[in-house]
Amino acid sequence: MRIEALNTAPDATEARFEEQIRPQKMGDFAGQKKLIDNLKVFITAARKRGEALDHVLLSGPPGLGKTTLAHIIAAEMGGSIKITSGPLIDKAGNLAGLLTSMKKGDILFIDEIHRLAPAVEEYLYSAMEDYRIDILLDSGPASRAVQLKLEPFTLVGATTRAGLLTSPLRARFGINSRLDYYNPELLQSIIIRAAGILNIGIDEDAAMEIARRSRGTPRIANRLLRRARDFAQVAGDASISLAVARRTLESLEIDEGGLDDMDKKILEAIVRKFNGGPVGLASLAVSVGEEQDTIEEVYEPYLIQMGYLSRTPRGRVATRLAMSRFAHPGISSQGSLFDTAEDG
């Protein structure tokens, strides 16, 4: 059975839950202290000058709070927020419709901004830099360009793959911030707060047990909390105890390091099938039956963070930690005799 408890992509139910528990002010946002402190300064200064906040780029693994921060920025600036994503804006005309509806101080949040089409991205340059866009009227020989002025707005872009952003787009963001994984103590406080909103009690040690297995990601921590609530309620328990938390995590096949079934498949494939690597992404994806993008964006960041995996120019390589844990007895942990070339 494939377990999806550690997938960092939100489903519709989860999106509604995140809306319910989302912090409304900078002071309520847990973690990312340096980033938050800097944003407070930038927002306060922009408000004192009566100006729109500089455009903000938020990067980092999924599920760490980029969308939440965009909402908080809009609230702190006293503007409205319009939400879209890179793949949804497939034509410059779609972007023009969004931009012309913005009022002074509004926030345009583009998730997965690295997936903007090149033509749409170029159309965004003048909007970000000069608050203007050029619209082409009619077609053929009678066509003419009309320049439209825009109200000063703030673009907040979110990306899990900052390296895919073009230099011209990246250069137009005045504020560039990266979100990092959370430590267990911060996740514990997030879990306890969310449990209060869900009207279910949770023991501190139970919250810490869930936190330790949440891959440093609030979205996963909140998802595991909801599953633990299910186990507690079915068992007739009024609150989530340590025993309930452990039973939940064991049932979801999440080990003490936060690794799930697919994490283990990836590491076992590299260690056992490819003798530790290097192995190309395409070969690895076929081996474990998962999409390349999912491996690269969802699974690899945490495996690298935890010291199980390295990316090299020739492919993915298992570290000594991974070799010692996942190698069959008798297999060397020194790496491959024959290197596998990178193919993705």
UniProtKB/Swiss-Prot annotation:
UniProt-listed Enzyme Commission number(s): 3.6.4.-
A GO MF term: ATP binding
Binding site residues for ATP: 21-22, 63, 66-68, 129-131, 172, 182, 219
Residue ranges of the region described as Head domain (RuvB-H): 256-344
One of the GO biological process terms: DNA repair
Chief localisation class: cytoplasm
Positions contributing to Mg(2+) binding: 67
SMART domains xrefs: AAA
Binding site for DNA: 311, 316
Annotated GO CC locations: cytoplasm; Holliday junction resolvase complex
Enzyme class label: hydrolase
Region annotated Small ATPAse domain (RuvB-S), chain positions: 183-253
Keyword annotations from UniProtKB, A to Z: ATP-binding, Cytoplasm, DNA damage, DNA recombination, DNA repair, DNA-binding, Hydrolase, Nucleotide-binding
InterPro entries recorded: AAA+_ATPase, AAA_lid_4, DNA_helicase_Holl-junc_RuvB, P-loop_NTPase, RuvB-like_N, RuvB_C, WH-like_DNA-bd_sf, WH_DNA-bd_sf
Keyword Plastid belongs to the record: no
Keyword presence, DNA repair: yes
Record field: transmembrane: none
Residues covered by region (Large ATPase domain (RuvB-L)): 1-182
CDD domains, per the entry: AAA
SUPFAM superfamilies linked: P-loop containing nucleoside triphosphate hydrolases, Winged helix' DNA-binding domain
Location of this chain's protein in the cell: Cytoplasm
Recorded family membership: Belongs to the RuvB family.
Subunit record text: Homohexamer. Forms an RuvA(8)-RuvB(12)-Holliday junction (HJ) complex. HJ DNA is sandwiched between 2 RuvA tetramers; dsDNA enters through RuvA and exits via RuvB. An RuvB hexamer assembles on each DNA strand where it exits the tetramer. Each RuvB hexamer is contacted by two RuvA subunits (via domain III) on 2 adjacent RuvB subunits; this complex drives branch migration. In the full resolvosome a probable DNA-RuvA(4)-RuvB(12)-RuvC(2) complex forms which resolves the HJ.
General function of this protein: The RuvA-RuvB-RuvC complex processes Holliday junction (HJ) DNA during genetic recombination and DNA repair, while the RuvA-RuvB complex plays an important role in the rescue of blocked DNA replication forks via replication fork reversal (RFR). RuvA specifically binds to HJ cruciform DNA, conferring on it an open structure. The RuvB hexamer acts as an ATP-dependent pump, pulling dsDNA into and through the RuvAB complex. RuvB forms 2 homohexamers on either side of HJ DNA bound by 1 or 2 RuvA tetramers; 4 subunits per hexamer contact DNA at a time.
Free-text comment about domains: Has 3 domains, the large (RuvB-L) and small ATPase (RuvB-S) domains and the C-terminal head (RuvB-H) domain. The head domain binds DNA, while the ATPase domains jointly bind ATP, ADP or are empty depending on the state of the subunit in the translocation cycle. During a single DNA translocation step the structure of each domain remains the same, but their relative positions change.
Record-given protein name: Holliday junction branch migration complex subunit RuvB
